């Protein structure tokens, strides 16, 4: 076996059990990875210099194929209702077969950090079969200085072999595709899928497992910080505006997806962004668009013209989930440190396709925990096959697939931090107003931005509020620059009876979903549940 590149020779591939490899390319930077990816036919070059790769049949994550080793350590720690389990013996067979499959192959290795705060970072070593995967994860995680590589020792090892096909009977998994996590031995295996996002989310899953024990809150959120050091967190599921609304020219971007909250403040887990590109335009999102024209960016499943190599961001023939991965410094106002003080504001974003939630509401600590555990948004027809109308989605902690522990662990951590640091919390509806999908209209982005500006500059917290009779939280009675009736959802509907019926339906959905958490929360959190205080 030959090694090419800079690495700690005392802790080589054999530490991960890998042996009889043809070659390992260690910590190659973008030019070297471009050469390898293009020579191997893994990717194409787009106009401007981005590397474009396809992922085949897997154009998104495979959450049902993700498994955690159930052993003496994890038995009482992992939320098994939400995480598939395999035995240590099944993982041993899987790991041995992974090692055998890798023999004779060339692999790419990246030594990286997950976490911008040194005291709470994980050293993640990622072995990949594809050169473009190596560039992807190099873009997404935090890159050590070159002189750190000679003494780097990994805490976590990830091996990603898309050509490996699992045997469900032998390995205890569901299909040929699998993501297997051994938290005790700190090994993660990814096979049978070329979707690069699995690597990024594997690191996130590991951090979500280990950090709560250290009193650090891991979060699926974006974050930014103002000139006065006033930071803000934006929680939200896909399609709620998390990336768009945290991108503010007046505020520095910490990150767009994964953060931690420690006794020192908040910090990004990553060193890059993984932005959706479907229908991306230079006019609407100029900073993200500019990254697609830069050398070093990886574009995933984006259709490009075979002759001109121009990308067509409106083409969803492969998937709606087209993306680009780029280092954070590609964004002009990105924070150079990825760290900030304790947040002044927390924003929970929801896309309410039923059109009954107000555009903004102020939450108490108990209400914030309730809505964090609920993780509500709504899917709209067209986003998923077979979906005819709005469908409520509850993804606890705004990221259920990545949460190994019980949601109450994260919810209680968040609630304690909110109370300790006197954080203002807001629920923001970026969905529909004046009716649901089909009868109403999308909440104007200018309204949402105006409300967020007032929330983040502190003026909204001093406004007059009314108690929403359907959902119980506090809603401002007026905000400068926002039409008053928009703050009263029922006033935006022509059919008041239909509004009441729809609101009642959504309240009942919240109540039904939260039953699974009632035994794990205090009475004040249970009391924060929507209860319909008026007859409807």
From Swiss-Prot:
Q: Which reaction does it catalyse?
A: oxaloacetate + ATP = phosphoenolpyruvate + ADP + CO2
Its cofactor is:
Mn(2+)
**Protein EC:** 4.1.1.49
Which key words tag this protein in UniProt?
ATP-binding, Cytoplasm, Decarboxylase, Gluconeogenesis, Lyase, Manganese, Metal-binding, Nucleotide-binding
Q: Which Gene3D superfamilies match?
A: 3.90.228.20, Phosphoenolpyruvate Carboxykinase, domain 1, Phosphoenolpyruvate Carboxykinase, domain 2
State the source organism's domain of life.
Answer: Bacteria
The record, for CDD domains, names:
PEPCK_ATP
Residues noted as binding ATP in the record, renumbered to the chain: 201, 220, 236-244, 285, 323, 448
Its annotated function is as follows:
Involved in the gluconeogenesis. Catalyzes the conversion of oxaloacetate (OAA) to phosphoenolpyruvate (PEP) through direct phosphoryl transfer between the nucleoside triphosphate and OAA.
Q: Which family does it belong to?
A: Belongs to the phosphoenolpyruvate carboxykinase (ATP) family.
What is the name attached to this protein's record? Phosphoenolpyruvate carboxykinase (ATP)
């Amino acid at each position: 076996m030959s090694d090419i590149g800079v690495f700690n020779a005392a802790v080589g591939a054999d530490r991960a059990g890998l042996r009889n490899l043809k070659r390992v390319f260690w910590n190659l930077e973008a030019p070297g990875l471009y050469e390898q990816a293009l020579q191997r036919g893994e990717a194409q070059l787009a106009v401007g210099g981005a590397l474009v790769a396809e992922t085949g049949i897997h154009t998104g994550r495979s959450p049902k194929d993700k498994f955690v080793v159930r052993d003496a350590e994890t038995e009482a720690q992992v939320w098994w209702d939400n995480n598939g389990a395999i035995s240590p013996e099944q993982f041993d067979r899987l790991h041995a077969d992974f090692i055998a499959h890798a023999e004779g192959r060339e692999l790419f290795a990246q030594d990286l950090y997950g976490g911008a705060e040194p005291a709470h970072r994980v050293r993640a070593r990622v072995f990949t079969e594809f050169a473009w995967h190596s560039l992807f994860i190099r873009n997404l995680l935090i890159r050590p200085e070159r002189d750190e590589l000679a003494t780097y020792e990994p805490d976590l090892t990830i091996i990603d072999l898309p050509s490996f096909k699992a045997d469900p009977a032998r390995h205890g998994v569901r299909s040929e595709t699998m993501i297997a996590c051994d938290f005790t031995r700190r090994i993660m295996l990814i096979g049978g899928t070329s979707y690069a996002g699995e690597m990024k989310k594997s690191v996130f899953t590991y951090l979500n497992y280990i950090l709560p024990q250290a009193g650090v809150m891991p979060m699926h959120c974006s974050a930014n910080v103002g000139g006065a050091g006033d930071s803000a967190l934006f929680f939200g599921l896909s399609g709620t505006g998390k990336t768009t609304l945290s991108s503010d020219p007046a505020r520095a971007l910490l990150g767009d997806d994964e953060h931690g909250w420690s006794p020192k403040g908040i910090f990004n887990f990553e060193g890059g962004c993984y932005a959706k590109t479907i229908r991306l335009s230079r006019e609407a999102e100029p900073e993200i668009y500019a990254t697609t024209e830069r050398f070093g960016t990886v574009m995933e499943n984006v259709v490009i013209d075979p002759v001109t190599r121009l990308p067509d961001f409106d083409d969803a023939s492969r998937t709606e989930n087209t993306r680009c991965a780029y280092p954070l410094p590609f964004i002009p106002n990105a924070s150079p440190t990825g760290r900030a003080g304790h947040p002044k504001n927390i924003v929970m974003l929801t896309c309410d396709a039923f059109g009954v939630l107000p555009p903004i509401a102020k939450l108490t600590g108990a209400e914030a925990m309730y809505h964090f555990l609920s993780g509500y948004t709504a899917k709209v027809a067209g986003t998923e096959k077979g979906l005819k109308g709005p469908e409520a989605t509850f993804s606890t902690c705004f990221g259920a697939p990545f949460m190994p522990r019980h949601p109450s662990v994260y919810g209680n951590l968040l609630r304690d931090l909110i109370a300790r640091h006197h954080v203002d919390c807001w629920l923001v509806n970026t969905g529909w107003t004046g009716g649901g999908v089909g009868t109403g209209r999308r909440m104007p982005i200018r309204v949402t931005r105006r409300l967020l500006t007032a929330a983040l500059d502190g003026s909204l917290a001093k406004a007059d509020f009314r108690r929403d009779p359907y959902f119980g939280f506090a809603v401002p009675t007026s905000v400068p620059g926002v039409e008053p009736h928009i703050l009263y959802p029922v006033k935006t509907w022509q059919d008041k009876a239909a509004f009441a019926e729809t609101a009642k339906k959504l309240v009942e959905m919240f109540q039904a979903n939260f039953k699974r958490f009632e035994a794990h929360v205090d009475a004040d959190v249970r009391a924060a549940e929507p209860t319909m205080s008026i007859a409807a």
